[in-house]
């Protein structure tokens, strides 16, 4: 089991154990605020804001919390000014990791991310030190319940998508960067709003992590990064065997 759904499953395990709902809402709110500031505070004319709101709704974020986050992104509103930063490095087992963050203090976030990498046997590198191992793509995600794999594949290809991967975790539809909005709109007409629609990083190849100690350290690193308020997403090229993942989750 590799890629997007594997990290999602690891985070689901953690969320079920630790009840990090408030922290998740904080991260979603920050993305909404930054998206509103980056363009117009109207989701109809701001694709990024629209996607951020859809992601928040998919997590059952309260409507008033969403509206408050949008207002904080309007011109003249008080609040912190966040900037987008990306960190790259190697985690346990030699896997490549890309960490995307929204921060109001670059030095603080860099220090905390570096500490997490170092604590669990990883190494934080320079910008572009591992991103060349990934392709920048658009990705639209729907829950598995929206339709069967064949139906989603047919609709996605017709909409102009490049690829679809379906499993018990959902349908992951890949697009060219410039086609994300067009594909999302076509699929939304067919299936309703997606869980998410955003640019992401797709590994060109995966690195197997079969040693239990390395896999455990990697999961702890992912947990620590996810605990950081500034970190929005973590992408990796790891592939942990399903039986080992089940054992560690147990």
Swiss-Prot record:
<dbReference type="InterPro" id="IPR049083">
    <property type="entry name" value="TACO1_YebC_N"/>
</dbReference>
<keyword id="KW-0805">Transcription regulation</keyword>
<dbReference type="Pfam" id="PF01709">
    <property type="entry name" value="Transcrip_reg"/>
</dbReference>
<feature type="region of interest" description="Disordered">
    <location>
        <begin position="1"/>
        <end position="21"/>
    </location>
</feature>
<dbReference type="InterPro" id="IPR026564">
    <property type="entry name" value="Transcrip_reg_TACO1-like_dom3"/>
</dbReference>
<dbReference type="GO" id="GO:0006355">
    <property type="term" value="P:regulation of DNA-templated transcription"/>
</dbReference>
<keyword id="KW-0238">DNA-binding</keyword>
<dbReference type="Pfam" id="PF20772">
    <property type="entry name" value="TACO1_YebC_N"/>
</dbReference>
<keyword id="KW-0963">Cytoplasm</keyword>
<dbReference type="InterPro" id="IPR002876">
    <property type="entry name" value="Transcrip_reg_TACO1-like"/>
</dbReference>
<dbReference type="InterPro" id="IPR048300">
    <property type="entry name" value="TACO1_YebC-like_2nd/3rd_dom"/>
</dbReference>
<dbReference type="GO" id="GO:0005829">
    <property type="term" value="C:cytosol"/>
</dbReference>
<comment type="similarity">
    <text>Belongs to the TACO1 family.</text>
</comment>
<dbReference type="InterPro" id="IPR017856">
    <property type="entry name" value="Integrase-like_N"/>
</dbReference>
<dbReference type="GO" id="GO:0003677">
    <property type="term" value="F:DNA binding"/>
</dbReference>
<keyword id="KW-0804">Transcription</keyword>
<protein>
    <recommendedName>
        <fullName>Probable transcriptional regulatory protein RC1_1808</fullName>
    </recommendedName>
</protein>
<dbReference type="InterPro" id="IPR029072">
    <property type="entry name" value="YebC-like"/>
</dbReference>
């Amino acid at each position: 089991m590799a890629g997007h759904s594997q990290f999602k499953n690891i985070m689901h395990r953690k969320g079920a154990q630790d009840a990090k709902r408030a922290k998740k809402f904080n991260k979603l709110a920050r993305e909404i605020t930054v998206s509103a500031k980056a363009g117009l505070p109207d989701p109809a004319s701001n694709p990024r804001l629209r996607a951020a709101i859809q992601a928040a709704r998919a997590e059952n974020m309260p409507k008033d919390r969403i509206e408050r986050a949008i207002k904080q992104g309007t011109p003249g509103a008080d609040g912190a000014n966040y900037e987008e930063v990306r960190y790259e490095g190697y985690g346990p087992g030699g896997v490549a990791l890309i960490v995307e963050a929204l921060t109001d203090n670059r030095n603080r976030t860099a220090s905390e991310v570096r500490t997490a990498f170092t604590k669990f046997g990883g190494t934080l590198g320079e910008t572009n030190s591992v991103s060349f191992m990934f392709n920048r793509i658009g990705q639209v995600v729907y829950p598995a319940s929206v339709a069967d794999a064949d139906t989603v594949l047919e609709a996605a290809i017709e909409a102009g998508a490049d690829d679809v991967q379906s499993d018990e975790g959902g349908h992951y539809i890949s697009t060219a960067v410039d086609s994300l909005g067009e594909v999302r709109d076509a699929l939304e007409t067919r299936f309703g709003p997606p869980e998410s629609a955003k640019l992401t990083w797709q590994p060109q190849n995966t690195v197997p992590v079969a040693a239990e100690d390395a896999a455990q350290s990697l999961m702890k690193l992912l947990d620590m990064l996810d605990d950081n308020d500034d970190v929005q997403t973590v992408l990796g090229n790891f592939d942990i065997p399903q039986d080992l993942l089940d054992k560690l989750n147990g």
